[in-house]
Amino acid sequence: MVRLFAPPCLRRVRTLEEEGYIQGYRGLLDPQRLGFEVTVFASVHLSSQADADLRAFEDFVRGEPLVRECWMLSGDVDFILKCVAPDMATFQEFVSHLTAAPHVRNVRTSLVLHNSKYAAAVPLELKVSD
Protein backbone atom coordinates (compact mmCIF):
# COMPACT_ATOMS: atom_id res chain seq x y z
CA MET A 1 0.00 0.00 0.00
CA VAL A 2 1.29 3.44 -0.94
CA ARG A 3 0.41 6.27 1.43
CA LEU A 4 0.19 9.59 -0.36
CA PHE A 5 -1.09 12.92 0.85
CA ALA A 6 -3.43 14.94 -1.36
CA PRO A 7 -0.92 16.99 -3.44
CA PRO A 8 1.37 14.05 -4.42
CA CYS A 9 -1.67 11.85 -5.01
CA LEU A 10 -3.26 14.48 -7.26
CA ARG A 11 0.00 14.82 -9.22
CA ARG A 12 0.08 11.05 -9.72
CA VAL A 13 -3.54 11.02 -10.91
CA ARG A 14 -2.90 13.94 -13.30
CA THR A 15 0.12 12.10 -14.73
CA LEU A 16 -1.97 8.96 -15.28
CA GLU A 17 -4.62 11.09 -17.02
CA GLU A 18 -2.05 12.82 -19.25
CA GLU A 19 -0.46 9.49 -20.20
CA GLY A 20 -3.86 8.06 -21.15
CA TYR A 21 -4.16 5.44 -18.42
CA ILE A 22 -7.22 7.18 -17.00
CA GLN A 23 -9.69 7.85 -19.81
CA GLY A 24 -12.43 9.46 -17.76
CA TYR A 25 -14.68 9.26 -14.74
CA ARG A 26 -18.21 7.89 -14.70
CA GLY A 27 -20.93 7.08 -12.24
CA LEU A 28 -22.19 3.50 -12.42
CA LEU A 29 -25.98 3.79 -12.77
CA ASP A 30 -28.51 1.00 -12.25
CA PRO A 31 -30.41 0.73 -15.56
CA GLN A 32 -33.45 -0.99 -14.02
CA ARG A 33 -33.90 1.66 -11.34
CA LEU A 34 -33.87 4.23 -14.14
CA GLY A 35 -36.59 2.39 -16.06
CA PHE A 36 -34.49 0.40 -18.55
CA GLU A 37 -35.98 -3.04 -17.99
CA VAL A 38 -34.64 -4.71 -21.14
CA THR A 39 -31.01 -5.55 -21.94
CA VAL A 40 -30.29 -7.27 -25.23
CA PHE A 41 -27.21 -8.33 -27.16
CA ALA A 42 -27.63 -7.96 -30.91
CA SER A 43 -25.35 -9.81 -33.32
CA VAL A 44 -25.10 -7.89 -36.58
CA HIS A 45 -23.98 -9.35 -39.91
CA LEU A 46 -23.15 -6.86 -42.65
CA SER A 47 -23.43 -7.53 -46.37
CA SER A 48 -20.01 -5.96 -46.93
CA GLN A 49 -16.84 -5.76 -44.88
CA ALA A 50 -15.30 -2.95 -46.92
CA ASP A 51 -13.67 -0.39 -44.64
CA ALA A 52 -16.05 2.37 -45.72
CA ASP A 53 -19.07 0.16 -44.96
CA LEU A 54 -17.72 -0.86 -41.56
CA ARG A 55 -17.08 2.79 -40.67
CA ALA A 56 -20.54 3.78 -41.93
CA PHE A 57 -22.12 1.19 -39.64
CA GLU A 58 -20.05 2.40 -36.68
CA ASP A 59 -21.14 5.98 -37.40
CA PHE A 60 -24.78 4.82 -37.53
CA VAL A 61 -24.45 3.03 -34.17
CA ARG A 62 -22.81 6.03 -32.48
CA GLY A 63 -26.03 7.94 -33.11
CA GLU A 64 -28.27 5.31 -31.51
CA PRO A 65 -28.95 5.99 -27.81
CA LEU A 66 -30.17 2.45 -27.04
CA VAL A 67 -26.77 1.04 -28.08
CA ARG A 68 -24.49 1.23 -25.06
CA GLU A 69 -21.58 -0.77 -26.47
CA CYS A 70 -20.52 -1.77 -29.97
CA TRP A 71 -17.76 -4.30 -30.59
CA MET A 72 -16.37 -5.33 -33.99
CA LEU A 73 -15.59 -9.06 -33.93
CA SER A 74 -13.73 -11.59 -36.00
CA GLY A 75 -15.54 -14.74 -37.07
CA ASP A 76 -19.19 -15.26 -38.00
CA VAL A 77 -20.51 -11.99 -36.55
CA ASP A 78 -19.33 -8.56 -37.69
CA PHE A 79 -20.54 -6.58 -34.65
CA ILE A 80 -22.13 -7.26 -31.32
CA LEU A 81 -24.18 -4.51 -29.70
CA LYS A 82 -25.20 -4.23 -26.07
CA CYS A 83 -28.52 -2.42 -25.98
CA VAL A 84 -30.86 -1.24 -23.24
CA ALA A 85 -34.48 -0.22 -23.60
CA PRO A 86 -37.34 0.67 -21.29
CA ASP A 87 -39.49 -2.13 -22.76
CA MET A 88 -39.63 -4.74 -25.52
CA ALA A 89 -41.80 -2.56 -27.78
CA THR A 90 -39.15 0.17 -27.80
CA PHE A 91 -36.42 -2.37 -28.48
CA GLN A 92 -38.44 -3.93 -31.32
CA GLU A 93 -38.78 -0.49 -32.93
CA PHE A 94 -35.01 -0.13 -32.70
CA VAL A 95 -34.45 -3.55 -34.29
CA SER A 96 -36.65 -2.54 -37.22
CA HIS A 97 -34.59 0.63 -37.57
CA LEU A 98 -31.33 -1.34 -37.25
CA THR A 99 -32.23 -3.94 -39.87
CA ALA A 100 -33.00 -1.13 -42.33
CA ALA A 101 -29.57 0.47 -41.85
CA PRO A 102 -27.21 0.44 -44.84
CA HIS A 103 -25.24 -2.79 -45.35
CA VAL A 104 -27.01 -4.70 -42.54
CA ARG A 105 -27.66 -8.23 -43.81
CA ASN A 106 -29.27 -9.62 -40.66
CA VAL A 107 -29.59 -9.12 -36.93
CA ARG A 108 -29.95 -11.79 -34.25
CA THR A 109 -30.86 -10.80 -30.74
CA SER A 110 -30.42 -12.44 -27.35
CA LEU A 111 -32.43 -11.15 -24.41
CA VAL A 112 -30.50 -10.95 -21.14
CA LEU A 113 -32.26 -12.93 -18.42
CA HIS A 114 -29.77 -12.31 -15.62
CA ASN A 115 -26.38 -10.66 -15.17
CA SER A 116 -24.06 -12.84 -13.08
CA LYS A 117 -21.05 -10.54 -13.22
CA TYR A 118 -20.27 -7.00 -14.28
CA ALA A 119 -16.76 -5.64 -13.81
CA ALA A 120 -16.22 -2.20 -15.28
CA ALA A 121 -12.55 -2.10 -14.29
CA VAL A 122 -9.64 -4.03 -15.76
CA PRO A 123 -8.04 -6.69 -13.48
CA LEU A 124 -5.01 -4.68 -12.40
CA GLU A 125 -4.14 -7.30 -9.81
CA LEU A 126 -3.02 -9.54 -12.69
CA LYS A 127 -0.59 -6.93 -14.07
CA VAL A 128 0.63 -4.83 -11.15
CA SER A 129 3.29 -6.17 -8.83
CA ASP A 130 4.68 -4.04 -6.02
Model-derived regions: residue spans:
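A compositional/biophysical signature of low hydrophobicity enriched in polar/charged and small residues
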Residues: 1-130
